[in-house]
């Protein structure tokens, strides 16, 4: 049963919905506030008609992992009208976002500090009997801006996580082959490309690919072309196999090569030595006369003002450009058309100021003013947005030729313009939330 109020825009009894800050294959993401303690929250909406619903499984996984450092808390799961709703902690930007702000290169010091946190995060997940299976920069976020945890790296989006052993008996899942591809092709392990059952070693290898991506700016298997997605994934896997680790890590601190060699030589059921892996990056910091002081590249931007200043500055430029474009478009429309267009686009006076979705997509056809537009419209918006964004994960049997649900399509050096726009909007809204909270 829906608990949404058409006047106060409250869901789940005491969660007020604010501005939309993102969307993807899962659905839509909004910022909001817990009316009991005034805590900022994130609300994820997923169509109940989704062919592959994920929010319920994600909620259950979060509940099993809750309490671990770097794992966001979840507060509510339920149904709101035509949507499933998950309420959780509101966090900051992803490592992919911060990578863009830093010119698509991180310093060895920053990558070493990131590596230590990511290793610890994945170790915690493994100790709860899960493997992540979709390691990528987009799935690791820093804490809420201005909070005590603003530089803590959080692991999010456990839609593809899987138990690798029985939590009661601790018996490991048996080794299998001819498995489906699960993960993001750019970062997945060689064994995953070969259709082998994933285990803890595959998470570690994927992390190594992420570390080298941060250092290099791109990976050798990006930008490969093929007639079909299946052929493209095969090409990516082949390129990974024929690229020597020395060549992949050439010109960068030796500790990254040592990490990759260790990860690729782990056995299927072998327990990783996480302490050893962290010690590699402690040694690196010591060798380059640095310390793990929490001063990441993104905190040093703009003479120490940080990434927030870049986000706000870029949004002002984007907003001016958008306003200029809209004005030029209006000048080309006949007066009668402009009048009719404005009438059609103007929200009803009965529509609340803060809608569950933007006013431009809220309609009276949905029954209650302020409710989301029809699931069909939202599904089309989600699909078009997901296709334009960063490398997307694959979950498809390797021998089949059917179209995967998500494709690794991002060009490494130049992100797609649509992705840039959505990211800038995200950061402005996040900043406005921070400012209003401080006031």
UniProtKB/Swiss-Prot annotation:
> Which residues are recorded as binding ATP?
21-29, 44
**Region Disordered: what ranges?**
366-426
Reactions listed under catalytic activity: L-seryl-[protein] + ATP = O-phospho-L-seryl-[protein] + ADP + H(+); L-threonyl-[protein] + ATP = O-phospho-L-threonyl-[protein] + ADP + H(+)
Q: Which GO terms describe its molecular function?
A: ATP binding; protein kinase activity; protein serine kinase activity; protein serine/threonine kinase activity
Q: Where is the organism placed in the taxonomic lineage, from the top?
A: Eukaryota, Fungi, Dikarya, Ascomycota, Taphrinomycotina
Q: What does this protein do?
A: Casein kinases are operationally defined by their preferential utilization of acidic proteins such as caseins as substrates.
Task: State the family named in the UniProt similarity comment for this chain.
Answer: Belongs to the protein kinase superfamily. CK1 Ser/Thr protein kinase family. Casein kinase I subfamily.
Annotated EC:
2.7.11.1
The entry's localization annotation reads: Cytoplasm
| Low complexity biased stretches | 372-413
Q: Which Pfam families match?
A: Pkinase
Nucleotide-binding among keywords: yes
GO cellular component, as recorded: cell division site; cell periphery; cell tip; cytoplasm; nucleus
Q: Which domain of life is it from?
A: Eukaryota
Which controlled-vocabulary keywords does the entry list?
A: ATP-binding, Cytoplasm, Kinase, Nucleotide-binding, Serine/threonine-protein kinase, Transferase
Protein's name in the database:
Casein kinase I homolog 3
Question: Under which main EC class is this enzyme filed?
Answer: transferase
Task: Please list the residues that make up the active site.
Answer: 134 (proton acceptor)
Gene Ontology process terms (BP): endocytosis; negative regulation of establishment of bipolar cell polarity; negative regulation of protein localization to cell tip; regulation of endocytosis; signal transduction
Residue intervals of the Protein kinase domain = 15-286
Organism whose genome encodes this protein: Schizosaccharomyces pombe (strain 972 / ATCC 24843)
């Amino acid at each position: 049963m829906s608990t949404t109020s058409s006047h106060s825009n409250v869901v789940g009894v005491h969660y007020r919905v604010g501005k939309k800050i993102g969307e993807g294959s899962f659905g839509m993401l909004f910022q909001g506030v817990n009316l009991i303690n005034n805590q900022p929250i994130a609300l994820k909406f997923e169509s109940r008609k989704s062919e592959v619903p994920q929010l319920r499984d994600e909620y259950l996984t979060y509940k099993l992992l809750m309490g671990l450092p770097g794992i966001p808390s979840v507060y509510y799961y339920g149904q709101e009208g035509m949507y499933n709703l998950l309420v959780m902690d509101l966090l900051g930007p992803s490592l992919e976002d911060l990578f863009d702000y830093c010119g698509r290169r991180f310093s060895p010091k920053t990558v070493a500090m990131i590596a230590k946190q990511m290793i610890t995060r994945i170790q915690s997940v493994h100790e709860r009997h899960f493997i992540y299976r979709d390691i990528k920069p987009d799935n690791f976020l820093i804490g809420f801006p201005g909070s005590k945890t603003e530089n803590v790296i959080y692991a999010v989006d456990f839609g593809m996580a899987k138990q690798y052993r029985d939590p009661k008996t601790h018996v490991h899942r048996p080794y299998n082959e001819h498995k489906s591809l699960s993960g993001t092709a750019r970062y997945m392990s060689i064994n995953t490309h070969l259709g082998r059952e994933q285990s803890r070693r595959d998470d570690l290898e994927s992390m190594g690919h992420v570390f080298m991506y941060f250092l290099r700016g791109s990976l050798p298997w990006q930008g490969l072309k093929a007639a079909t997605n299946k052929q493209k994934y095969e090409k990516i896997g082949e390129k990974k196999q024929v690229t020597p680790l020395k060549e992949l890590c050439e010109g960068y601190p030796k500790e990254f090569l040592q990490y990759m060699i260790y990860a690729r030589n782990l056995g299927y059921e072998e327990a990783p030595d996480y302490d050893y892996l962290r010690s590699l990056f402690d040694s690196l910091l010591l060798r380059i006369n640095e310390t793990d002081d929490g001063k990441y590249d993104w905190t040093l931007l703009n003479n120490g003002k940080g990434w927030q200043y870049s986000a706000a500055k870029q949004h002002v430029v984007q907003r001016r450009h958008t306003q200029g474009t809209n004005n030029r478009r209006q000048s080309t429309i006949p007066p009668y058309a402009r009048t009719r267009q404005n009438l059609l686009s103007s929200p009803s006076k009965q529509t609340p100021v803060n809608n569950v979705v933007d006013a431009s997509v809220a309609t009276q056809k949905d029954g209650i003013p302020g409710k989301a537009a029809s699931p069909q419209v939202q599904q089309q918006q989600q699909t078009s947005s997901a296709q334009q964004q960063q490398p997307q994960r694959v979950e498809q049997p390797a021998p089949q030729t059917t179209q995967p649900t998500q494709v690794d399509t991002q060009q490494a050096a130049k992100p797609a313009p649509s992705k840039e726009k959505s990211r800038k909007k995200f950061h402005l809204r996040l900043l406005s939330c921070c400012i209003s909270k401080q006031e």
